[in-house]
């Protein structure tokens, strides 16, 4: 048994799941052993990732790697919101999409990719643009919003919905060789 796996499972080959929906099962302990053994992280933090619901707005240049890392890290529920379709010119930087996805909605392509990477998560694709008619409904059931869009209209709307619902918001932006990241923790 790998040393990190042994430490994550407390040296046991199998960890019983006593029917608790809050405990990690053996598969999770093995898959996420490298997280679990990090000082200050442990099984509780991994369980919290598994139980979290994240809304990712945008499955393009920034959303693509974000979605891959969230699924690999063990986030349990991802909602992927994007109204665009995969274009061949996207493929060199939007690494979540494949040649076979050209012409498909990015939200659906990304959903398929994260489920291939981690078949134990729940992923929902919403082929739509964040708008005044759907923002609050989309945001309200999530623990975190990640705004990976490239326009101010959507960014302001995501920020307003986060403030109204009290949902933490992280927005990122990239342009050529530069990037910015901001975290908004709303306390109502």
Task: Identify what each model region corresponds to.
Residues 1-186:
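Adenine nucleotide-associated cytosolic modules
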């Amino acid at each position: 048994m790998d040393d990190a796996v042994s430490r994550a499972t407390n040296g046991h080959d199998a960890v019983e799941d006593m029917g608790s929906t809050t405990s990690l099962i053996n598969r999770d302990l093995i898959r996420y052993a490298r997280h679990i053994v990090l000082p200050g992280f442990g099984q509780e933090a991994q369980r919290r990732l598994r139980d979290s619901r994240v809304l990712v707005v945008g499955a393009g240049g920034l959303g693509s790697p974000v979605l891959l890392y969230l699924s690999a890290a063990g986030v349990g529920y991802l909602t992927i919101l994007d109204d665009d379709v995969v274009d061949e010119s996207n493929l060199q930087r939007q690494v979540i999409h494949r040649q076979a996805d050209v012409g498909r909605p990015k939200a659906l392509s990304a959903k398929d990719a994260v489920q291939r990477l981690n078949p134990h998560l729940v992923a929902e694709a919403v082929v739509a643009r964040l708008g005044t008619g759907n923002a609050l409904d989309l945001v309200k059931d999530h623990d975190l919003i990640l705004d990976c869009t490239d326009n101010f209209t959507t960014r302001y709307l995501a920020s307003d919905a986060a403030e109204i619902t009290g949902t933490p918001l992280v927005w990122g932006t990239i342009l050529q060789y530069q990037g910015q990241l901001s975290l908004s923790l709303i306390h109502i």
